[in-house]
Amino acid sequence: MESLLTDKQRSDLETSIFGYVSRLTNDEALLSQLAAVLSQPSGSEPVPADTLKANALLLEKKWLSVIRLQRKVMDLETRLEAAEREASSTHKANGLGAGDPKTWLPKTSRFSLLHKQPVNAVSFHPFHSTLASACEDGNIRIWDYELGEIETTIKAHTRGVLDVDFSQPDTGASRDKSHDKPRADVSHAQPRALLVSCSSDLTIRIWDPQNEYANVKTLTGHDHTISAVKFTASGNHVISASRDKTVRVWSVQSGYCVRTVHGHTDWVKSCAALNEEFIFSAGIDHVTRVSEFVSGDGKMTLLGHEHVIEGVAVYPKSAAGCLAKLDKTSSYFVVSWSRDKTIRVWSSRGDPLLILRGHDNWVRGVVLHPAGRYLVSVSDDKTMRCWDLEQGGRCIRVVDAHGHFVTCVAWAPNDVNGRVRCLVATGGVDGQVKVWQ
């Protein structure tokens, strides 16, 4: 029968067996015969008895090591079972989101990761346990959020990094959001993910995580600070918003600007895209604009905010969850947030559907729960708030998130099987990146 051991492992085992037997008997004839038998499988010359006797205790030591390891494994299994029981009882005591990813909401941060200056943006890698954070010092830090450790620091820009975004390649996974699962076990054949960043140094840079975050493209063309940057869903284009009052569309492959969208009368603070069909932008002029992706022509303006609009996001009806119940005929839903302390939800026809009030200062970031029931927002009032869309947008949780203004929030994309991950990141002026898990 073919051995499962290598020649070296088999030789060590034979040596240990002979050493053990040699301690039990002094019968030289028996030991010589055993030595010859044990050496035969490898085809080598008989090992001298003196050499084998030197390893007399080796087998016993290995056996004791196995016993100790087995005890440790049993002890760890016992501790794990106790921890799982405690976690289960804690979830049930907390009520909301008791073990169900569809209703889980952030409550306690798991890690606090530190920058030396304010954090402006955070973004999760679509496959790996990796988080990127953009800092006012011009650096991007890449964190392993499972370990709470920094992986690398990218000296990205000569001035503050204002936004970062990982592309989200389509894995072909189903969109069943019934359960949460880590993304650690993924195929090497995954689509390529890239990271994009923008800065007040007037450049947009694309980085390759598969090549130690090498800078693979630098996009230039804006005439002033670049406030926001986002990949389109396909990953083929990047859209950017700038203080030069324009939104630009860039080809990832060529690095060229393929379209410039005009229409705003002041600094454009935020942008988003829907299926390379529409572009959404908002800023200091208090207006959210909807433009055609292909032509750049304006389609619609959303009016209602009474102060600077800090951000805008768009969700297709298929991913909108409870938002779809607000207007069954709307093909997508727009969410905007502002320095007027409100969050507003709009239909694809431009109708205002919800106004969420509760923050005591500028609203700086909003994200939709992947299951579609909740909105999570952060603000200069140092809090993170959770809004239940099933209850008409009622605020159901207020979390003291940071010791200073909270500037950004991100929810991890679903795992490779399309299941919700209970994982949120926030960043603040206090220089902290917090992971809520």
Curated annotation (Swiss-Prot):
Its main location: cytoplasm. The keyword Cell division applies. It comes from the Eukaryota. Residues 64-94 form a coiled coil. GO terms for molecular function: dynein complex binding; microtubule plus-end binding. GO terms for cellular component: cytoplasmic microtubule; kinetochore; microtubule associated complex; nuclear envelope; spindle pole. Residues 173-186 have a biased composition (Basic and acidic residues). InterPro entries: Dynein_regulator_LIS1, G-protein_beta_WD-40_rep, LIS1_N, WD40/YVTN_repeat-like_dom_sf, WD40_repeat_dom_sf, WD40_rpt, WD_LIS1/nudF_dynein_reg. Residues 165-186 are annotated as: Disordered. Pfam families: WD40. GO terms for biological process: cell division; establishment of mitotic spindle orientation; microtubule organizing center organization; microtubule sliding; nuclear migration; vesicle transport along microtubule. It is found in: Cytoplasm, Cytoskeleton; Cytoplasm, Cytoskeleton, Spindle pole. PROSITE patterns: WD_REPEATS_2, WD_REPEATS_REGION. CDD domains: WD40. Self-associates. Interacts with NDL1 and dynein. Belongs to the WD repeat LIS1/nudF family. Positively regulates the activity of the minus-end directed microtubule motor protein dynein. Plays a central role in positioning the mitotic spindle at the bud neck during cell division. Targets cytoplasmic dynein to microtubule plus ends, thereby promoting dynein-mediated microtubule sliding along the bud cortex and consequently the movement of the mitotic spindle to the bud neck. This is Nuclear distribution protein PAC1. It comes from Yarrowia lipolytica (strain CLIB 122 / E 150) (Yeast). The gene is PAC1.
